[in-house]
Amino acid sequence: MNPVRKKALLLSAYDARSHQQWYQMLTDGIKDYEWTVVTLPAHHFFWRARSNGLSFALEHKKQLVAGYDVLVATSMLDLATLRGLVPELATVPALVYFHENQFDYPLRSEELKQRIVNAQFTSIVTALCANRVLFNSDYNRHSFISGAQKFIKQMPDGLSPAIPGDIESKSAVVPVPIKDISVNTEDKAGNTIDLVWAHRWEYDKQPEIFFDALEKLYDMPEFVASGLNVQLHVMGQSFREVPDCFQQAQHNRRHNVKTWGYQSRGDYYRILANSDFVISTALHDFQGLGMIEAIHLGCTPVAPNRVAYPEYIPQQLLYDVSQPQQESTALANKLCHLLCSDEIWSQQTASSGLDVSGYLENQLIARYQAEINAL
């Protein structure tokens, strides 16, 4: 006779693709629970952040009252409102997972900064309401806690300064896992370097820094003398508004571009497995799953010494961003240093300290199960 499995409810209040991949891993990998997944579409961000508790209660009441042993939710959820509207969930122990937080986005306008306040406050209340809070990186946890502290200081009254500490005391860091991908590699000419930039084509990933650094690199005498043939793979999801720098860069480096634009998952992994370097210029990356996947597939990362990158990228592969106006120069210098020195090349490929095996799904699924079991 098979044992009766516990029932787990998983709520994704803003069902982005990365969140889907995360909870698919949970529901496939943790077999001790019978999972029910309920989601809301990933659009109208500010409205979804404000209304999701009510939307869940009105649109999915039958599923929500089916009797659960645990509740697992992404951090967009307005947990306090949901528990008030659906009393059957009020005593179900809840784990909230933060893929990101609303305090550390590089917002472009004062209007957006004002509009994000509701989402920031809701995230504090949700974290306070949860029994357990998980973050995907130390950087994410630290920026959330420090952001909550600043937020509370700015409010007129009614918010205890002890709240961030209370949240931190019931939190832990458990990264989003990657799969153990295996891809065949191809032979190539000895003087060819394949270089990847793969992010969303949006301002917060700073594509203009990458392209400006490339132009500076190509003008450096040491690089010119090396005779290296650098092939570019510029990948990632684009949207209706694409920064102007992409079109200009595609024209300027048309003889070097080997891949341009969004790729299928299979082609994306194949390109990573056959490339040498993966570059980030991101202003914010709460974990950097794409960078971790690229490292796992054999790419050497070059990234800014900020956000989550120092947690898994050795210092010698991070470029300095202490002078923002000089960031593209710092990246160009780092690339030239790595590409043009045989000694450095051999050292960084053989003993750079890169190891992301701890991010593999088979290493992390047991930690997730232990966290859920402990609720």
Feature map (PLM): residue ranges:
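A charged, aromatic-enriched C-terminal amphipathic alpha-helix characteristic of glycosyltransferases
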Residues: 47-51, 325-326, 330, 340-375
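Aromatic "clamp/platform" in nucleotide-sugar-dependent glycosyltransferases that forms part
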Residues: 283
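Short alpha-helical donor nucleotide-sugar binding micro-motif in glycosyltransferases
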Residues: 270-275
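Short hydrophobic beta-strand element within catalytic cores of glycosyltransferases
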Residues: 300-303
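Donor nucleotide-sugar binding/catalytic pocket of nucleotide-sugar-dependent glycosyltransferases
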Residues: 131-184
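Conserved donor-binding/catalytic core segment of Leloir-type glycosyltransferases
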Residues: 175-179, 186-216, 233
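Nucleotide-activated donor-binding/catalytic signature segment of Leloir-type glycosyltransferases, i.e.
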Residues: 236, 243-266
